[in-house]
Amino acid sequence: MGSEILVGIGEFRVAKGAVLKTIGLGSCVGIALYDPKLRLGGLAHVMLPQSGNGTKRSAKYADHAVEMMTEAMERLGSDRKRIVAKMAGGAQIFKHMTMDMLRIGDRNAEAIRTILRDYGIRIVSEDLGGDEGRTVYFFTNDGRMLVKYSRGGELWI
């Protein structure tokens, strides 16, 4: 296992031979991209489904995060055709809020699915929804993702 790199809210990181970690995924979604040939991976902590017109480019938005992470991986020699994705998060932390506008977790997940499809990137596994926060560890040496739940328990995806 390589060094651990923390990915903050609204940030992304790309690395080889490291463990990328993001904490506090409630309605936010952690998107991991992986190139198995290069053993190169990236992780973003996305807060919102899409940016508005004229919004500064930031990984806190799903549309920008996928674009920025893909570009960073391609600069390091990755081919988009080889990249696969994993996602975790998108919880409905406040179950009593049912208005669609407040269902940020669902909206984040759907936006990411659409963007990845547009980029031709296949989602190979996901752990989305529910009502529990998550911490994600993404192992760039082999593409595995460990999801730890805020109330205990874990899942490898």
UniProtKB/Swiss-Prot annotation:
Q: What reaction(s) does this enzyme catalyze?
A: L-glutaminyl-[protein] + H2O = L-glutamyl-[protein] + NH4(+)
Q: Which UniProt keywords apply?
A: Chemotaxis, Hydrolase
Q: Which SUPFAM superfamilies match?
A: CNF1/YfiH-like putative cysteine hydrolases
Q: Which GO terms describe its biological process?
A: chemotaxis
For this chain, one GO molecular function annotation is: protein-glutamine glutaminase activity
Stored InterPro entries: CheD-like_sf, Chemorcpt_Glu_NH3ase_CheD, Cytotoxic_necrot_fac-like_cat
E.C. number: 3.5.1.44
> Of which family is this protein a member?
Belongs to the CheD family.
Q: What does this protein do?
A: Probably deamidates glutamine residues to glutamate on methyl-accepting chemotaxis receptors (MCPs), playing an important role in chemotaxis.
Q: What is this protein called?
A: Probable chemoreceptor glutamine deamidase CheD
What is the species listed in this Swiss-Prot or TrEMBL entry? Archaeoglobus fulgidus (strain ATCC 49558 / DSM 4304 / JCM 9628 / NBRC 100126 / VC-16)
